[in-house]
Amino acid sequence: MNAVSQPVAHTAAGAVRGEVDPRTGVRTWRGVPFGASTAITGRFRAPQPVDPWKGELDATRFGAPAMQGTFGLRGTVLGSEDCLNLDIVRPDTDDVLPVVVCLHGGTFVTGASHDKVLQGHHLTKATDIVYVSVNFRLGVLGYLDVRSLGDDCVANPAIHDQILALTWIKDNIAAFGGDPDQVTIMGESAGGAAVMHLMCAPGARGLFHRAIAQSPPPASVHSRIQATMWVRALTGRVGLPPNPTLDDLRAMPAEDLVRAGQSMMINSKELLQFNTSFMPTIDSATLAEHPIDTFNQGKQAPVPMIVGTNSDEASFTKALYQTAGQRLRAARRALDVFDPDNAGDVIEAYGDVGQRRDFAALMGDAVFWAPTVIVATAHRMVAPTYMYRFAYASAAMRMLGLGAMHAADLVAVYGDPYATKAAKFDRFGSKETFEKVSELMQHHWGTFFHTGAPGQDWPVYGFRHDGQPGRATAVFDTGMHVEHDPKAEHRYAWESFDMREWGANRVDFWD
């Protein structure tokens, strides 16, 4: 590297020329390719390394994100199949720094490395890291197992993409001043789930050393039977004849496949995407078994982990159903597809689920908090585990009934109060408090990036012993404090609920 306005780094494939951002003063390299195009012959196959190039590659513009729908009336499709690229941000120094790799969220179907909230400039300066955000295949092209149509494919292209990116980072990040032996992977929502999938994937072992999963849905996986059903639905929706082949899908315009996949999601009738059309499939290469089973058996990567959820993950569901009866039926239906024998006991633990507040609490816990507690409980047996709850919400967000909703923690962790539209409400009337919370979270996240522990005032999610209550949880509200085994009564209710299997006898939406 050289300390000029256009820093050049030399990777194994060739030189890349970045720039110093005039607004934030950090060095950036955007759209750096780590894999070859996945179009046509590469579709549904494992990714291949990028071919070398001559001269300096211009890395001053963001690369293409993965192909994805916009869920608008026009059926617009964004992105490209040539999407295997990443963005790198670091302070304008020549220090060797720990590396943080961000895997974006977006329900496994949307998102990009350069989503404004994830660009990482403020986080990089606050925590002194080399920050890498990654693009990988999504939706029908990244999270649909099409092996029922032939063997010339892989089950989880997106996970293979992520492993290739981590391999590239291990081999090349030193050229950007990053320490390849201090790599933290982090993600939120589907990105948090991706972190856990990589912890379970044998091919990712040794490519990272710490993990942060924010609001992950750990139970969001398909069995091969479920994936086969979704493939059948897709091929019917795009008008392929009976007994289609992989070549038939590869011959179709990618835009048509993405639109069909978007239509499948909209019409699947699955509340809150408990089990959407697109998510990883249990296979023999990346996910040998359900991630919850992998964690319970202690087979995951034994690395220090921060994991947690927000207090009001599913507050937006309050507006989805207008009557108490509708909410009760929706709650029962959502849980019955997993474990009908124990669904009633869980629902009873949440009081009157016909009321909006209790209904939203149940839904958020079902998708995020309850399975996260299971994972944290298991992981503490193999590595230091740190649990948190993000509870900060401005007066405006509380007045709207949204509270600390899903993804609200991102703005605090990344430190950019202008990154999202919702962040405007965090600033409204409470700017100083928000900045305090953001500084606290960045301090603890940064300490973890550098040391593998978030600080002495945040205990491990440990066991009850010597009079200590155990299950220490850092709560970020207007400040930070520690609670032990919060929501214990709800945790007890979920202990007998099996969230690993889904819809074994469901056929009503394959018609």
List PLM regions with ranges.
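Non-catalytic accessory segments of hydrolases
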Residues: M1-N156, A423-M441, F449-D457, M480, ...
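Short, solvent-exposed turn/loop segments enriched in Gly/Ser/Thr/Pro and often Arg
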Residues: R137-G139, M186-A190, R389-S394, V460-Q468
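C-terminal domain-tail junction helix/linker
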Residues: F463-R491
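Short Gly/aromatic-enriched secondary-structure transition segments
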Residues: T24, T28-D51, A319-F338, V460-G470
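Substrate-gating cap/lid region and adjacent catalytic-acid/histidine neighborhood
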Residues: R210, D256-E432, H444, T451
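A structural signal for well-ordered alpha-helical segments within the folded catalytic domains
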Residues: R27, E81-L84, H160-I163, T167, ...
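Serine-hydrolase-like catalytic core of hydrolytic proteins
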Residues: F71-L246, S263, S268, T294-L320, ...
